[in-house]
Amino acid sequence: MKVRTSVKKICSSCKVIRRKGVIGVICTNPKHKQRQA
């Protein structure tokens, strides 16, 4: 899990999601998981 100020899709299977106002990226590759700080 990476915490970043700006979250971006890294590959084609990355999805930008919003949960309770928190923007994040979920992917099949665990290295691509991101959350916005």
Swiss-Prot record:
Keywords: Ribonucleoprotein, Ribosomal protein. GO terms for biological process: translation. The keyword Ribosomal protein applies. InterPro entries: Ribosomal_bL36, Ribosomal_bL36_sp. One of its GO terms (molecular function) is structural constituent of ribosome. Transmembrane segments: none annotated. Belongs to the bacterial ribosomal protein bL36 family. This is Large ribosomal subunit protein bL36. It comes from Leptospira interrogans serogroup Icterohaemorrhagiae serovar Lai (strain 56601). The gene is rpmJ.
